[in-house]
UniProtKB/Swiss-Prot annotation:
Signal peptide (UniProt feature, chain positions): none
Pfam hit, one: Rota_NS6
Organism: Rotavirus A (strain RVA/Human/United States/Wa/1974/G1P1A[8])
Main subcellular localisation: host cell
Name of this chain's protein: Non-structural protein 6
Superkingdom of this protein's organism: Viruses
């Protein structure tokens, strides 16, 4: 398997895993969602330092994952203040 295909599979698996995790969380557990998101982001940052460049995500991809998570939080939480607080909490 060539390096480009390896990277594509890695990114797809990462996005699928993130997406399925967020869909399993109920709209009432916003704090759980934020903690899980923070763990994912911490893990991604760790991957930036220990894996070869083929597996590294660029800053734009990390930001896109944050935005997807923020959109999920917004869609599943009807308390605007809690949503804004969560978005501030996970944003760099």
């Amino acid at each position: 398997m060539n390096r480009l295909l390896q990277r594509q599979l890695f990114l797809e698996n990462l996005l699928v895993g993130t997406n399925s995790m967020f869909h399993q969380i109920s709209k009432h557990s916003i704090n759980t969602c934020c903690r899980s998101l923070q763990r994912i982001l911490d893990h991604l940052i760790l991957l930036q330092t220990i894996h070869s460049p083929v597996f590294r995500l660029d800053r734009m991809q990390l930001r896109q994952m944050q935005m997807l998570a923020c959109l999920w939080i917004h869609q599943h939480n009807h308390d605007l203040q809690a949503t804004l607080g969560a978005i501030k909490w996970i944003s760099p």
